Amino acid sequence: MGKNFSRFAAVLLAVSMPAAAFAYTFDRDVPANIKTQMLDDLSFVGTIQGSQASSLHQQIFGQVDGATYNQFFSSRVMSVGMNGCGDGNAVACVIPMQDSSKIWLPQNYIKFSHPQIARLMVVFHESRHTEDANDNWPHANCPTPFLDKDGSDMKSVWTGASLAGEPACDETPFGSYGSSMIMLKNISKFCTNCSDKVKMDAGIYADDQFKRLISPDAIAQVQKDLYSGQ
């Protein structure tokens, strides 16, 4: 995520919904395989069924339910295009001064291979950045140094880039990092029709994104909501 887009860019997601049912469009420069992949990913998320939802998930999305996720995404994102996003470390971005309902994909989204649920994490992260009424949920700068529990530098799970000092953290569970990790953690815990692999991947990526929350209050809220008893 680039400093020039520190408020807006993200370095930081039964029966399938047919691709024609999606309301958003793809620019011509989006590679055909990436368009197909994203449509397949969003069709998959539309099939999810859950037994329950955590309190924070209910506040942000509602129930753990495919139709709920599709409505959340399609009510925010109208189009997808290609853009460098201002920084070689970016994975995707929204640029509100150009179009706050458009997700832009740089080469990092294409060239790195990650599980389907991780790709959904990225685009749902970006969908939160479309919310003009919430100032597009700007990120906070990560601490310097920014270390994990073992004392190693925190790095992007997607690109491996160092996060210290970068606008790649959040101080609220309701921003892009918090909302997407809450979504994935709920899928990991409560999805009733997901494979073990999907639930495992969702848990791994959710736990990684949880580390992007840097305020004690935000951390405490998510711990109480999703990690108590673990």
Name every feature range the model reports, one short phrase each:
Residues 123:
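Substrate/cofactor-recognition hotspot
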Residues 126:
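Walker B catalytic acidic pair
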Residues 1-9:
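Bacterial N-terminal signal peptides that target proteins for export
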Residues 9-18:
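Bacterial N-terminal signal peptides
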Residues 21-120, 130-230:
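Predominantly extracellular/secreted Zn2+-dependent metalloproteases
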